Amino acid sequence: MKYYLEITLLPNPVINLLTLWSKVFQQIHLGLVEMQDNQKRVPIGVSFPEYIIGEKYSVLGGKLRLFAQEETTLARLDAPKWLSRLSDYVHCTGIRSVPEKLNGYAIFQREQPKISKERLARRYASRHGIDYDSALLRYSEMAHKLIPTPFIRLKSLSSDNTFCLWIRKIAVTEPSSNTFSSYGLSATSTVPEF
């Protein structure tokens, strides 16, 4: 990845950071969907430079970076256009070259923890054709599990359901391939850290 642009979420008393993340990431996701190839791969990856991993919880911070191999790829995305209705709440830099001195690389991937009794029961009920209450009994003994991974709450435009996009960071020493999902995430592709 040779080029990037950075989006900073601006502190604001009107809208909290979690709500702002939802609005910003929804717009970036829509822009990335427009750039998918026929195998649903995207040439732009995301990183969260202020991501902090803790034992009990982690945070995304207030910055988002978009990376691409070519400057024209980021120009084609046109992130400021996608974020225009949020211009009072975000600052978007121009396209810049990635610095030569890096701290390493990271993989930002989607994590789908199976923690919610309710979610598991809904899924079980729909798969096995039983009612929700019966399915919930199946998981009644399940202990509550705290997931420290940070997330962004998004709304599916196809199903109108709200869901959490859990984002896990893995630090690595070597770069790897450059294709990502329509969320800019990947289980194998890296982005530079600086």
Each model region followed by its residue ranges:
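Extracellular/virion structural assembly segments
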Residues: K2-P13, F25, E71, A75, ...
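Residue-level recognition of well-ordered beta-strand positions that form the cores
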Residues: E6-T8, R65-F67, R153-K155
